[in-house]
From Swiss-Prot:
It is found in: Cytoplasm. CDD domains: S1_IF1. Its main location: cytoplasm. GO terms for cellular component: cytosol. This is Translation initiation factor IF-1. Residues 1-72 form the S1-like domain.
Amino acid sequence: MAKEDVIEVEGTVTEALPNTQFRVELDNGHNVLAHISGKMRMNYIRILPGDRVKVELSPYDLSRGRITYRYRS
């Protein structure tokens, strides 16, 4: 999947799930299942419920995504 194909949206983490996966409610009201990107994992960036995050969605499966950025609160 090329970088140009992703859809970037913002949302709020509502639930932390096992295996570094999170339930994220997007600004448009949809809920997606998202995992942490590799660079966030390498730099030990912690994500908690209530955090604002940027999520990349694939155009092929809009119910799953990758968390690429956690906004400062």
